[in-house]
Amino acid sequence: WATKLTMAVNVSARQFREADFIGRIESLIARVGIDAFSLELELTESVLVDDLEATLEKMAQLRRHGVRFALDDFGTGYSSLAYLKRLPIDVLKIDRSFTMDIDAPEHSGQGKRPAVLIDAIVAMAHQLDLRVLAEGVETLAQQERLLRSGCDLFQGYRFSRPLPEAEFRAWAAAQQ
């Protein structure tokens, strides 16, 4: 499984706008010795708001090195479908605010809305050849419902809490 491991890194709008951002990523790839295809930069919609053309150019430069991109927290911000049409992203990350109520009973006040929205997001993303990651998965029931919706990947406390490096290494070794 380690050969399939992807290192996903959150990137803030401020970091992404820095003039030397591309050089820093290239240097990091060389210094650490990872395959650039194993690096996935997670960008929130706020990164895109200021200057879409400059964002697209930076993404294209990094993509030429093999870096992949995820659109993080989809559905919580400026969510323009025009972004999905233009951005060279690989993964759409559905925000936990959608997934946390996916297994709520229909009489809970939420009704079918969370599931219907997730079904629609997943269907749209798959039509755009994007993988879909559901954030905030905490229970088996949520995971099973998200699987039925077609989610490809999952993140949340059901699998692990965030770990310091040493604990991650021990966890990873135990998975082999």
Regions found by a protein language model. Give the residues of each.
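A short helix/loop element that forms part of the nucleotide-sugar donor recognition site in Leloir-type
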Residues: 22-26
